[in-house]
Amino acid sequence: MGFLFRPKELPRPASLTFTLDQAGHTYDDGHVGLAPTDITISELRVAVIGLNGAGKSTLLGLLDGSLKANAGTVTIAGGEERLDPAVKKDAKRIDNLVGKVRREEIPNSYYKADSIREAIDEPLKKHKVPESERQAIIGNLFAHFDLAAVARESASALDSEKRHLLAIASALSFSPAAIVADEPTKGLDEVASAHVAKALFSYDKQVVFATHDTELITRAEYAIDRTLVVDDHQVVFDGGPHEAVAFYTDLIRAKYEAAKA
């Protein structure tokens, strides 16, 4: 299901190409989040797997512009645009082009709104989106993400599955070209996880996401094009989802055996 809101200033590309050219990030405390990495991502469905602390979130932060590379460069391209997150003007445009999802996190303002419909409507209103378009946007999102029945509920009244769905709907409310999602099904049981994944991957948007759910990425209906395995702050495998899961399983087994030795 596609989407209709488009800013008038610049055309919205159908998808993006993310390029890391020896790009890495070291945090202020000296901890290496991601070693210098060369990678280009243009596929529509890309998964990132790895153990806790391996560097997945840092990689996603470089892709969505929430982290700046302090080694190498990051370029985000779409249509005729080539954007550098380190450039202030480009960073603002990237915020518009890349929707960010962090588990079930939603803006704090959502908890202050009387309803989740109002919570999504208010930012659109502030950006002077006409009422007819706002209603179409919200109706589209709430129908697709199964939120219509709880539209008048407050964010705090939602269960975990609905909050995950709302987090994705929120990221899509300004119709970005791509979604970068850090563990969009974290903490959910098998049924709820499948519901959220189906809604996310059936929406007509490019998705780059991190997960620990290796079964999810190998399910044919989600059509994952490519999977990266991150370990020890670097990408150690880049290929198809089934091959990536086999590699990852062997990697974990080797770490376990080494720990026993």
Predicted regions and their residues:
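Conserved ABC ATPase signature
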Residues: 154-158
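Conserved beta-strand-loop-alpha-helix hinge in the C-terminal portion
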Residues: 234-258
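ABC ATPase NBD coupling module
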Residues: 81-101, 126
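Catalytic Walker B motif of ABC-type/P-loop ATPase nucleotide-binding domains
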Residues: 179-183
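Helix-to-loop junction immediately C-terminal to a conserved catalytic motif
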Residues: 64
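Conserved ABC ATPase "signature" region
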Residues: 133-150
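Q-loop/switch helix immediately C-terminal to the Walker
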Residues: 104, 112-126
